[in-house]
């Protein structure tokens, strides 16, 4: 059935009704969208080298769009879930829960199993740099990370 706008208006003007489309099948396209948090991607912690004789050590965090994170520090490998949310007062908060830790030595020389641990930080982000702060005002920021990959 081919229906035009003029045909519908003419039919209505003469006291007619609209055709019953209940028998007509319609296909509706479904579109999925994902909103990525600002921190999605891979970040590297800036580490100060305390001993020139020691090889350089890298600590990296990868935040996925599915609220999964993967971390590595020296020989240590971890993964888990994260939540990044606006607090309404001050900086956004980042909560990371470690679900697995291989309990290997990290860049600071420590060997601690962090499985089950939850880290909470407030995030101050400027361009390709992110700082993890202890307070929502961003006055006590101990860790600075640089974006490696989007």
Question: Where are the language model's segments positioned?
Answer:
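Short, low-complexity, Pro/Ser/Thr/Gly-rich segments in the mature regions of secreted, periplasmic
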Residues: 141-149
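Short, solvent-exposed coil/turn segments at beta-strand boundaries
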Residues: 39-40, 60-69, 87-88, 122-129, ...
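Contiguous, well-ordered beta-strand patches that form the walls/edges
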Residues: 48-55, 70-128, 134-136
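N-terminal helix-cap/turn-to-beta initiation motif at the start of protein domains
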Residues: 27-44
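Bacterial Sec-dependent signal peptides at the C-terminal "C-region" and cleavage site
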Residues: 8-26
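Sec-dependent signal peptide recognition
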Residues: 1-8
């Amino acid at each position: 059935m081919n229906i035009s706008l003029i045909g519908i208006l003419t039919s209505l003007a003469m006291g007619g009704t609209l055709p019953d489309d209940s028998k007509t099948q319609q296909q509706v396209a479904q579109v999925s969208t994902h909103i990525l948090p600002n921190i999605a991607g891979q970040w590297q912690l800036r580490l100060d080298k305390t001993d020139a004789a020691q090889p350089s050590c890298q600590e990296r965090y990868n935040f996925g769009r599915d609220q999964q994170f993967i971390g590595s520090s020296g020989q240590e490998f971890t993964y888990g879930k994260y939540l990044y949310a606006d607090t309404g007062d001050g900086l956004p908060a980042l909560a990371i829960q470690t679900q697995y830790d291989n309990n290997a030595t990290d860049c600071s020389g420590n060997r601690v199993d962090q499985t089950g641990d939850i880290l909470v930080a407030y995030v101050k982000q400027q361009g390709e740099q992110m700082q993890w702060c202890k307070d929502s005002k961003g006055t006590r920021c101990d860790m600075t990370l640089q974006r490696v990959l989007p």
